[in-house]
Amino acid sequence: MYICPVEYEIKPHQKLNLGLKEIWLFREMLFFFAWRDIKVKYKQTVLGFLWAILQPLLLMSIFSLAGSALNIPSESLPHPLFTYSALTLWMIFSTGISNAGNSMISNANIIRKIYFPRLIIPISSVLTALFDFLMAFIILIGMMIFYHDRIKFELDKFLLLFPVSIIITVISTFGIGSLLAALTIKYRDFRYVTPFLVQFLMFVTPVIYPISVFHFTGSKYLLAINPMYSAVELFRSGFNGQILELRLVAISLFFAVMLFIVGIYYFRKTEADFADLA
């Protein structure tokens, strides 16, 4: 009995094409990479997945104490809630781009041996960061319940703004992460540049301070160039009673999309050389 062999034709990718159909065909590999990264991250740790919660909690404690000592305003929110709400979102961004930046080098052996859509690797890094966010988000819900009498929680507003903030975060994380992944495999110096980039971006994002601390004209529009500015502010808007200007959201969303396009373009442009560079 003759069985017709299955053939898979590898074609050059269009540089702005995500290749969603191909990624869907390799979806099991995508979930394998994501779950493997999650298990490896917490392997041989006593507390395991609890570190996804403890890390932002410990940072919250430090920043809240510093904020209280320095009289940094917190937009009428309790300092712990003000800080922790931003940190949970920030962890997606910082963890996502840090892991994605090193992902091609970490998976060098697999890249050299078999073919699969290379974008699966940075996507799995973002999925891993989203898993940590979901773990930390459980504590955030508990904090909102605990501080219910001191916040202005509006369910309909929160349900509207929460997805928008997540979308901005994921788009910008994937864009920068893909760009860094392609740059790092070619220029290993970026392994040392990325941590400084993450730290710098954190201090230009209103994680531990409100935008009101800046008094010069146009400061909010300048900061809105950073997509995480609007992402964090939108996230908080669901329970601090404030409304972010639509123009600021538009600016952040524009730059998030631009980062996404640049990241995908450069990744697609250079991915043919990954196997040789790995």
Regions found by a protein language model. Name each.
Residues M1-A278:
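Hydrophobic transmembrane alpha-helices and immediately adjacent juxtamembrane helices
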